[in-house]
């Protein structure tokens, strides 16, 4: 039996709170069960040097975990003087996923910086971050349109993400830490609101998985993401 008596296809309770902070153009507290991530989207004029004169905008992301977001305290990466490989991998994933949802030409020569800070971690922090950041991004883009900084809406579609995996021989959706840490397979899936795949990250950490198991996990992800996007839409409305 899964924690909380969840079925294999069931996500944790998901909550999205908009306008969580006062200063960012878009800010969201996203909660996947006990995983809580603060996501902000900041609109800034100008683009990186490689895009100057192109008429195209840019979106980039940063990710971090508070020292006591985990069971035992960890040092801040700033105190260590460098980011871990895991942090760099996750923030690149968040940036790639969100860029897929935006028409950068419609953004003009402006940049959106997304910051995802994990307040409390219980598995699935990167998928929660992508999900919350998408809503913060929508609010930042609406702010920019309201200010006349962009004309047409650069957002192409909503995106969301969820973890899936195989635990005790069974494919399950939205793994919390006790499941994730013991899973034979761990996978993260990012999809659009129409069910198209943006990214799949999957690793057999214990036993290799079959083609059939892969399809089962993707189907679980599609079902879970559909529900998560419904939650995004409800928050935005």
Curated annotation (Swiss-Prot):
Catalytic reaction equation(s): tRNA(n+1) + phosphate = tRNA(n) + a ribonucleoside 5'-diphosphate
InterPro entries, alphabetized: ExoRNase_PH_dom1, ExoRNase_PH_dom2, ExoRNase_PH_dom2_sf, PNPase/RNase_PH_dom_sf, Ribosomal_Su5_D2-typ_SF, RNase_PH, RNase_PH_bac-type, RNase_PH_CS
UniProt-annotated binding residues for phosphate: 86, 124-126
Annotated signal sequence range: none
EC numbers for this chain: 2.7.7.56
GO terms classed as biological process: rRNA catabolic process; rRNA processing; tRNA processing
Gene Ontology MF terms: 3'-5'-RNA exonuclease activity; tRNA binding; tRNA nucleotidyltransferase activity
Keywords: Nucleotidyltransferase, RNA-binding, rRNA processing, Transferase, tRNA processing, tRNA-binding
Keyword rRNA processing (UniProt): yes
Gene3D superfamilies: GHMP Kinase, N-terminal domain
Assembly: Homohexameric ring arranged as a trimer of dimers.
Name under which the protein is recorded: Ribonuclease PH
Organism per entry: Shewanella amazonensis (strain ATCC BAA-1098 / SB2B)
């Amino acid at each position: 039996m899964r924690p909380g008596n969840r079925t294999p296809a069931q996500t944790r309770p998901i909550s999205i709170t908009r306008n969580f902070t006062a200063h960012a153009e878009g800010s969201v507290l996203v909660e996947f069960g006990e995983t809580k991530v603060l996501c902000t989207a900041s609109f800034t004029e100008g683009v990186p040097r490689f895009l100057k004169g192109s008429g195209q905008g840019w979106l980039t992301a940063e990710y971090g975990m508070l020292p006591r977001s985990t069971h035992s305290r960890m040092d801040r990466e700033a105190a260590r003087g460098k980011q871990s490989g895991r942090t760099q991998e996750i923030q690149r994933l968040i940036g790639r996923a969100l860029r897929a949802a935006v028409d950068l030409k419609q953004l003009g020569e402006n940049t959106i910086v997304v910051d995802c800070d994990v307040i409390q971690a219980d598995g699935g922090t990167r998928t929660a971050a992508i999900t919350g950041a998408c809503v913060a991004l929508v609010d930042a883009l609406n702010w920019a349109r309201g200010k006349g900084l962009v004309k047409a809406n650069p957002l192409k579609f909503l995106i969301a993400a969820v973890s899936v995996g195989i635990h005790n021989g069974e494919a399950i959706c939205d793994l919390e830490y006790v499941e994730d840490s013991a899973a034979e397979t761990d996978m993260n899936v990012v999809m659009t609101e129409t069910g198209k795949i943006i990214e799949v990250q999957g690793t057999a950490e214990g036993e290799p998985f079959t083609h059939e198991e892969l399809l089962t996990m993707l189907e679980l992800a599609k079902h879970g993401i559909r529900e998560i996007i419904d939650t995004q839409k409800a928050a935005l409305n």
